[in-house]
Amino acid sequence: MSNRELFNEACQYIPGGVNSPVRAFKSVDGIPVFAKKGNGSHLTDEEGNEYIDYICSWGPLILGHGHPVIKNAIIEASAFGTSFGLPTQLEVEMAKLVVESYSGIDQVRMVNSGTEATMSALRVARGYTNRSKIIKFEGNYHGHSDGLLVKAGSGALTFNMPTSPGIPEEIISQTLVCTYNDLSSVEKCIAEYPKDIAAIILEPIAANMGIVPANAEFLKGLRKLCDQHQIVLIFDEVITGFRVSYHSCPEYLGVIPDMVCFGKIIGGGLPVGAYGGRKDIMEMVSPSGPVYQAGTLSGNPLAMRVGLAQLTYLKEHMEVYEHLESSAQYLENGILKILNKLSLSYQLHRQKSLLTLFFTTQPIQGYADVQTCDTAMYALFFKEMLAQGILIAPSQFEAWFISDAHTKEDLDKTLDAVYNALVKCHDSLSD
């Protein structure tokens, strides 16, 4: 069946034809690519078209598709069993590896998704502080739990629905929204609710409104404010965890949070999430403490074995991070040269192996700047890239993910496609 035929059939049985909104390609006015198989840096769809893949499952596939370490781990796990509803040695090994890799955390609890991780972390922070309000930032996305789907990024920004219908006002009222990279907005918020704020949660590198890093002064200021007011500082590292560095953002950015949320890379492509923190905070979690959180498939042996295999490989092969940086820098420099050659002033942001080409001339610091992007132009660009066999995010507000499997040949083909696509996009406007 063709992608179009599959999508038409999917729309009969699945809301919008997809199980996560961005996959519908709606924001680029396209038909979804229905994936059939992946190999290394390449993905093949149901029509037999092959693409150089920069979606990479939205982040988990840091080693690329079908890496032998991942394949072998899946085979090994299936021989033992996929779910027991009991603790396993794998959970212990996984938790130990995560804790030892991340500065400032003593314990970690496994869950099934990034959404579960952030939702649970906030519950624990509220229980620990005995406070109810939280601060988040415009354009930061922390999953689809009610209290966090307020002025959010990712699909909420892509589809211009930053605050979803279906969330009661009494829940929204507990979420205070501040401006990313603007410490004064946080100071004003704390001054208004000095004894009510349990936690500040943020993406230390925002990756769900495109790549927008928090500046150093902003992060250090948040750390200081949280210390002064006994507020729990939570880093959402679902995307950045184990990607920007094996030791994640504390090593890369130099600020240590009180709690952290993981997902994506720690599962090696299987559904997984985790949240961790200092021992005094994590001891609030049941059965050690009174804050309840549970899950039938939390810490399931299949995800644990595969995640453990990927993290162990990364730990033992730190050259992966050198290759990722080299590849990403090569791609960044190539795109900058193209923009200069074509006299285009679009904004290109890169943080390690995460990249976004913003179709705006406005310097990007936060949510308001991102909203100046020409999404119609991005849609044209996306289609031209796809036609040349390059699969990038079907949304202006999502990142490109570079994997260890991407080769120089892949990058050169990508740069050729970027040049051709930009030329065609701008020719179409002048016609």
Language model regions located:
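Conserved N-terminal phosphate-binding loop of PLP-dependent enzymes in the Aspartate aminotransferase
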Residues: 1-431
